[in-house]
Amino acid sequence: GNTPWCIGLGSGDATGWPATDWMEDIMLRTHKPAVYDQWVTNEMPFNDKRVIEAMDFFGSFAKNDKYVSGGSKAVATTDFRDSPKGLFSSPPKCMMHRQASFIPAFFPEGVKAGQDYDFFYFPSYSTKDLGNPVLGGGTLFAITKDSKATREFLNYLGHPQSNEIWMAIDGSGFLNPNKLIDLSKHSSDTFRGLNQILLNATTFRFDGSDLMPGAIGAGSFWTGMVDYTSGKSAKEVADKIQASWDAIK
């Protein structure tokens, strides 16, 4: 049959980060949000069995030659920007690719959403009763010099009208959880669909590795996931990442 996945972890000095997103999505879909929060802050050790199980779930296909294009050895060496190209080869090298909403920027020129490709919500477990968790990043605004005008501007940014101005800009990528927005204002069906996923979320959590200290979230977690897909066991990798946590406490 067809190979299910195209996966690439390569990203120059940041190689490994795409696998951290996989881990975060899996943790949100297998455990309650409080457990995710404990994992991110290391209140729950990185080598807790629940984290190891999540890593091995990722490995059940990422380390299986039958489930990933190019075989498991290609996962760590394929650049994440190149990995979706297998979707569009003839015949296709894979049927699915998991990545954030920006990934179409790296698709071959001329391919069209809804015609050459489409997307779906990363499924939640029907047996876990954890609702519809969504993982994401975003922009946060903060006041550095307080004034009435500044506060009025921030209030306006929370108003549907300001949101819809951004939504209407072609290719802006602007997604918003504001339930008062008019989805028809989006520049495309793709962004309407992506925004609907966000509106349907019962839980939202910020990217876990981005919340972790840099030595872990942009260090040992990245390299650990490369080590894991290259052959090390989940326990070995989790123990090493936990050691890096311990080293900064």
Please identify what each model-predicted range represents.
Residues 1, 79-97, 223, 230:
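Short helices/loops that flank or line small-molecule/ion binding pockets
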Residues 24, 55-62, 85, 89, ...:
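Non-transmembrane alpha-helical segments in soluble domains
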Residues 40-77, 122:
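Glycine-centered hinge/linker elements that transmit conformational signals in sensory
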Residues 102, 108-173:
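Extracytoplasmic/periplasmic substrate-recognition and gating elements
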Residues 120, 167-220:
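Long, aromatic- and glycine/proline-rich binding clefts that accommodate carbohydrate-like moieties
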Residues 1-44:
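Extracytoplasmic/periplasmic solute-binding protein
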Residues 198-249:
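Conserved C-terminal helix/tail region of periplasmic/extracytoplasmic solute-binding proteins
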Residues 1-14, 159-170, 247-248:
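Bilobed periplasmic-binding protein-like "clamshell/Venus-flytrap" ligand-binding domains
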